[in-house]
Structure formats: C-alpha cells, structure tokens
C-alpha cells in the first residue's frame, strides 16, 4: 500500500518523504501457540533518503520508541543482506546459493552445513557461507565479516553502511545495538540494512524493518 501511495498520489512530492501508518494486522498463529491473531501495527517509512543517514534516522527512531515505551532490556539487533547475498552471487554452484539462502531464512544451520559440505565450491567460499550467518556481537564482528569475504575473493566494502550506522547513532542508541548476520528476513526485496527490536521476556520482536530501495527504483 505504501509503494502504491507513493508512486501515485505522492509521485510529485519533494523527497525525502517521512510517512507513518497505523493499521490492524491479522496473522495466522500456530495451533496452541496462544496469543492474539490480530494486533495493531505501527510503521514508519523514510522514502528517498538513499544514503546511510536514512539508516541512522530510522534506527534512532526505533530506539527512541522502545525507550519511550519503557520496554525492559530493550535491544536492537541489526544486520545486512548484502554480504551474504554477494557471497552467494559469486558461487558457481547455483543450487548451493539457492539452498543456502533458504536454510538461513529457516534458521536451519544443520541443513546449511550439509549442503555446503556437498558442494564443490572452493573451501574459502564454503567456510564463509557457513560462518557468516552465524556471526553476531558488537561492532567488532564487522571486521570478521570483511575478513571472511576477502578470503572468499570479495573485496567490496559491504560493511561500510553498518559502520556508518554505529558512528551516526547517539551514544544511548548505540548502546542497545548489536549485530547478527542471520537476520536476513524472508522477504527478498530488502537491499541492505535489516533490523529487529526486542524486549526482555518476549520471544518475538516488537519491531522490525530494513532498507528496500529496489521497490522504488524499478
């Protein structure tokens, strides 16, 4: 709906656009899982901010929201789809690339390792595919991402946006941020940053989002 709104009624508007929406959402719950099938979803869209300043603005907004809600042990876990997708794009084994992405979407790391072990890809590439989605921690983990990609033959600065995010956040927002490269989201339209916000005692995220430039660029 947001894409349709922007491409029709707002196509002549000055960028960037800052939009907010609130709507009821119905989702299927697993049997006996408990909880409501309908809830209110509040969302924010920043459209036309193509640089890392947009990432900083949105993550800062999420951090402020969880702080204002006084959620216990609130934290934001971020990643990027770019390193893993670029790694898979470099694979000659296209079946491995497709299966590896499916396994990460499903959090099936046993299946991922089995599929990687059966591939004839170079060992450095196979090691990177297995390890990269397991990486998590503070900003120091970004160095390990770069090292894995470099050994696999990928030298593009694919963690640059995440480093800029850390540098651009206010100290109180950076304190609740960590990284996890298993966060890929099952929607293939994401093109860079992805994130989830959690609160203590709740197994599911209270918020999530990411960058999806390609939807608006064609």
Regions found by a protein language model. Give the residues of each.
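Short His/Asp/Glu-rich catalytic/ion-coordination signatures at enzyme active sites or charged loops
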Residues: 89
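Glycine-rich, mobile lid/loop segments that gate access to catalytic sites or pores
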Residues: 75-86
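Positively charged, Gly/Ser-enriched RNA/tRNA-binding surfaces
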Residues: 1-72, 92, 115-218
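Acidic, His- and aromatic-enriched active-site or binding-groove loops in soluble protein domains
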Residues: 92-117, 121
């Amino acid at each position: 709906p947001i894409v349709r709104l922007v491409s029709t009624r707002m196509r002549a508007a000055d960028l960037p656009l800052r939009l907010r929406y609130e709507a009821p959402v119905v989702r299927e719950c697993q049997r006996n899982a408990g909880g409501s099938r309908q809830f209110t979803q509040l969302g924010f869209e920043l459209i036309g901010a193509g640089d890392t300043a947009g990432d900083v603005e949105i993550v800062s907004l999420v951090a402020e929201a969880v702080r204002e809600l006084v959620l216990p042990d609130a934290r934001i876990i971020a990643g990027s789809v770019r390193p893993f997708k670029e790694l898979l794009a470099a694979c000659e084994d296209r079946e491995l690339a497709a299966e590896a992405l499916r396994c990460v979407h499903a959090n099936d790391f046993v299946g991922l390792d089995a599929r990687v072990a059966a591939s004839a890809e170079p060992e450095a590439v196979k090691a990177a595919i297995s390890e990269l989605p397991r990486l998590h921690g503070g900003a120091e983990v970004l160095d390990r991402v770069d090292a894995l990609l470099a050994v696999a033959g990928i030298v593009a600065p694919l963690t640059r946006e995440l480093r800029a995010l850390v540098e651009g956040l206010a100290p109180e927002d950076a304190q609740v941020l960590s990284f996890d490269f298993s966060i890929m989201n099952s929607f293939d339209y994401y093109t860079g940053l992805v994130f989830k916000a959690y609160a203590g005692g709740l197994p599911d995220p209270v918020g999530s989002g990411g960058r999806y430039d390609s939807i608006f660029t064609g």
